[in-house]
A protein has these predicted regions:
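FAD-site-proximal beta/loop scaffold in flavoenzymes
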Residues: 149-171, 251-323
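Iron-sulfur cluster-binding cysteine motifs and their immediate structural context
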Residues: 1-26, 72, 79, 144-145, ...
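Fe-S ferredoxin-like electron-transfer domains
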Residues: 1-72, 76-77, 84-91, 134, ...
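Beta1-alpha1 glycine-rich phosphate/pyrophosphate-binding loop at the start
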Residues: 16-20, 46-117, 141-147, 185-230, ...
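Ferredoxin-like iron-sulfur electron-transfer modules
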Residues: 1-2, 34-49, 85-86, 114-117, ...
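A conserved FAD-binding loop/helix module that cradles the flavin
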Residues: 316-344
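Glycine-rich dinucleotide-binding loop and its adjacent helix/turn
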Residues: 27-42, 100-120, 141-194, 294-304, ...
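Short hydrophobic core segments
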Residues: 129-137, 177, 270-277
């Protein structure tokens, strides 16, 4: 499943909406119709250069062109597509699918200059570009030095595998070292390579702590790759890889169990050892262009804009955060595009469904049958999400109607909460509602014992309250339009006092 499916609210009823397959069907069946309707957005005068035509670069160009910017993409390879075209195996995605993505941005007026390597962002600025987006990826191979014997890098192998259609000389026994998604692609490609009989996936932790997606690992195992956990490679000699046996230890800074040596060793048959660990970002490019980097060599960026220390220069995708997913690259591209444009990509996008439609789907079981009908199972939690209300055993999170507001608002009632954490566990966002929701306190004393933003009603008749907002406590009269409190919060407090007075402790 994709990350969005792990967070899908449908999980609480039966199984998630099959978002991944639904999007695939939409892309495959809708292309011919959509491509004919695509046009560039209304020109807004912005001129932007994008360095790199991988997923992050293509997404950046798409969002900018859709909003009317003039965009030129510079790509050092002969074709656009980045690692997806040159590294990701064809059994994962076809060149035809990549070509279709590229055709979208070309139809929107984006110019793509292939075979063109950019070394200076200042030269681009001198050519009149208002902003430069660097989307060069994490294409610097990670290394793992053995005491004896040589290894080959996974990115090089995958590139050779794709270029030769699997005719790479590896021998009969191949060991892939690593636990990420790149290691999974490498193992599957090695299994398909001419002359290979056995592929072993060696990882120093257990399956539980692998960074690879669960479905990626399952595919590897289903295809016959042999998984060997708790092994750390030492040396390659005479067709055998000597490994130290490891055991799990205490948790490290990443939240995964650390490993310690047991003192034992194990040998794994290996004619070739492929290392799929730690692809790195192109630090040298950043430094040469005056872009500040952190201790790991990644560009220092403003997370809200993706802008670097060099004014008007943005870094997106793997080049900003290290090897990650295409979805994360697209997110970065959208953030950077909005920052450059100074507004949303498309204004006034309609939200499908009414509030009644959203509520009517709750608590109705609807099992997945086929991807074409999955949209009927969607609970539209991007519009109405009240999981924290539904799962609280004490009913401490309450949905209330606020006059003048289109949607219900959720408040947290402090004195009804025992901090069980249920709402945090079920929240599809990175939130803990019992801490983050605007909170109704029974008294000033209770407010003093908490750090939550919220309010305590001092006098219901005069609507006098104590309010904490952004950590600052102040007195207010909720029905006073001249009060300095935000209009929305005044309305919410008035709704509690007028329509939900049973919540106020006398």
């Amino acid at each position: 499943d994709s990350n969005c499916m792990y967070k899908c609210t449908r999980n609480f009823y039966e199984e998630p909406v099959n978002i991944r397959n639904t999007k695939l069907i939409a892309a495959q069946n809708g292309y011919d119709t959509v491509i004919g309707e695509i046009n560039a957005g209304t020109a807004d005068g912005k001129k932007v250069a994008v360095v790199g035509a991988g997923p992050a670069g293509i997404a950046s160009a798409y969002f900018l062109a859709r909003a009317g910017a003039s965009v030129t993409v510079f790509e050092k390879e002969e074709k656009a597509g980045g690692v997806i075209r040159y590294v990701i195996p064809g059994f994962r995605i076809s060149d035809d699918a990549i070509d279709k993505d590229v055709s979208f941005i070309q139809k929107m007026g984006v110019e793509i200059k292939t075979g063109t390597e950019v070394k200076s962002v200042q030269e681009l600025k001198a050519q009149g570009y208002d902003a430069v987006i660097v989307a060069t990826g994490a294409n610097k191979p990670g290394t793992l030095k053995l005491e004896k014997g040589e290894t080959i890098n996974a990115l090089k192998f995958l590139r050779d595998f794709k270029a030769t259609d699997g005719k790479v000389a590896l021998g009969k026994n191949v060991v892939v070292i690593g636990g990420g998604n790149t290691a999974m692609d490498t193992a599957r490609a090695a299994k398909r390579t001419e002359g290979v009989e056995h592929v072993y996936l060696v990882y120093r932790r257990t399956k539980r702590y692998m960074p690879a997606a669960e479905d990626e690992l399952l595919e590897v195992l289903e295809e016959g790759v042999e998984f060997k956990e708790l092994l750390s490679p030492v040396s390659l000699e005479n067709g055998k890889l000597l490994c130290k046996k490891m055991e799990l230890g205490s948790m490290d800074a990443s939240g995964r169990a650390g490993v310690t040596e047991t003192g034992e060793t194990e040998e794994v048959l290996a004619d070739t050892v492929i290392v799929a660990v730690g692809e790195k970002v192109p630090t040298e490019f950043y430094e040469a262009n005056g872009i500040a980097v952190n201790e790991r060599g990644k560009a220092r960026i403003n997370d809200k804009t993706m802008e670097t220390s060099a004014e008007g220069v943005y870094v997106v995708g793997d080049g900003a955060r290290g090897a990650a997913t295409i979805v994360e690259a697209i997110r970065d591209a959208q953030v950077a595009a909005k920052a450059i444009l100074g507004h949303d990509i498309v204004k006034g996008q309609p939200v499908p469904g009414t509030e009644k439609d959203c509520y009517s789907k709750k608590a109705i079981l609807k099992e997945s049958k086929d991807a074409a009908n999955e949209s009927e199972r969607c609970l539209t939690c991007n519009k109405v999400c009240e999981n924290c209300v539904d799962v609280c055993p004490n009913r401490a999170n309450i949905s209330i109607k606020v006059p003048g507001m289109a949607m219900n608002q959720v408040i947290h009632v402090d004195y009804m909460c025992n901090e069980c954490g249920n709402c945090k566990s079920f929240c599809p966002y990175a939130s803990a509602p019992y801490k983050d929701k605007f909170t109704l306190f029974a008294s000033e004393a209770d407010m003093a014992d908490s750090t939550n933003d919220g309010f305590a009603v001092i006098n219901p008749e005069t609507k006098e309250c104590k309010v904490r907002l952004l950590g600052q406590i102040s007195d207010c009269k909720a029905d006073d339009a001249n009060d300095k409190l935000y209009e929305g919060l005044r309305r919410l407090i008035c709704a509690v006092i007028d329509d939900y007075s049973y919540l106020i402790m006398k």
